[in-house]
UniProtKB/Swiss-Prot annotation:
HAMAP family: RdgC. The lineage of its organism: Bacteria, Pseudomonadati, Pseudomonadota, Betaproteobacteria, Neisseriales. It comes from Neisseria meningitidis serogroup C (strain 053442). This is Recombination-associated protein RdgC. Pfam families: RdgC. The gene is rdgC. GO terms for biological process: DNA recombination. InterPro entries: RdgC.
């Protein structure tokens, strides 16, 4: 239930969907399995295993999940069958098979195999935090995060969400913190970072499980490199990697949060309820602190 990586979008708090209205809209875009000649199918599915509902509400949070099912049809399989058919025509009819005919044969083979192809599925989850006005997506890859945002907009007929565009760039803030050897407020340096230089061949330095205040690490910044990823700990509650794109990776929720969730959840539903609230609230407060150190939002 705890997101291990996060992309987030600030929302218009005055135009957030209610749980029932959101569920009704998502029901119109519910997931169905791939049919016949479909290469893939995508739609909303139950975000928790113990309930068939498409929205899992917990106080001021709403959890949703987008499922995608794709047909797996290896190109090598199609190529082998095509070669067999071409050879058969050449042998039986004593003629060559042209490019256009090969393409037609390839399409026929694909259409024949698709209904019987194996499938693979993936899912992306998101939580609406209506108190703070954020959509938290359980994926740091921009394509995946943008996809569920697009699907939500389509289902709802619109959703006012924006990219997290701050006055100061995350890279600039991270570089400054590493250079000065400490962070501001409730943040502390952890033990991982990535730095990049400039030029035609961009030099990349990755530091793992080291003291980030050490001279050999700080020297990279003094030599002109900028920090693109930085390991941070927030108020002894969350450890994570902040990226230059303002996404969070390798998130670890430390014992204090885990124990609080467990103390408030007696069964699967109760634990999911408590975990969702604690995760959404703590992450959102942490993000707001980061935004303040980044100079606030761009107008």
């Amino acid at each position: 239930m705890w997101f291990k990586q996060i992309s987030f979008y600030p929302l218009n708090k005055e135009k957030l969907p209610e749980a029932d209205a959101l569920a009704d809209k998502l029901a119109e875009a519910e997931f169905t399995h791939c049919q016949g000649l479909d290469w893939f199918s995508e739609g909303f599915t139950a975000p928790v295993s113990f309930s068939p509902e498409l929205v899992f509400p917990a106080d001021f949070t709403l959890r949703v999940a987008l499922k995608k099912e794709e047909k797996v049809l290896p190109a090598g399989v199609i190529r082998d069958i095509l070669e067999e058919k071409v050879a058969e025509i050449q042998n039986n009819e004593a003629r060559n098979v042209g490019r256009k005919e090969k393409q037609e044969l390839k399409e026929q083979i694909t259409d024949d195999l698709l209904p019987r192809a194996f499938t693979r599925s993936s899912r992306t989850e998101a939580v609406f935090n209506t108190r703070h006005g954020y959509l938290l997506v359980n994926n740091a890859a921009s394509a995946k995060a943008e996809n569920i945002l697009t699907k939500l907009r389509e289902a709802l007929g619109g959703l006012e969400a924006s990219l997290p565009n701050t006055k100061q760039s995350p890279s600039s803030l991270m570089t400054g913190w590493l250079l000065q050897g400490h962070c501001e407020g409730g943040f502390e340096l952890d033990s991982d970072c990535e730095l990049k230089g400039t030029g035609d061949i961009v030099p990349v330095v990755k530091v793992s499980k080291q003291d980030l205040t050490a001279d050999e690490v700080v020297q990279h910044v003094k030599n002109g490199k900028t920090v693109t990823q930085l390991g941070l700990v927030w108020r002894e509650q969350i450890a994570f990697i902040l990226t230059q794109d303002f996404t969070l990776k390798r998130i670890q929720y430390l014992d204090v949060l885990q124990e609080e969730a467990e103390s408030n959840g007696d069964d699967a539903a109760g634990l999911a309820f408590a975990s969702q609230i604690l995760m959404a609230e703590s992450v959102s407060i942490m993000l707001e602190e980061l935004v303040s150190y980044l100079g606030g939002w761009q107008d």
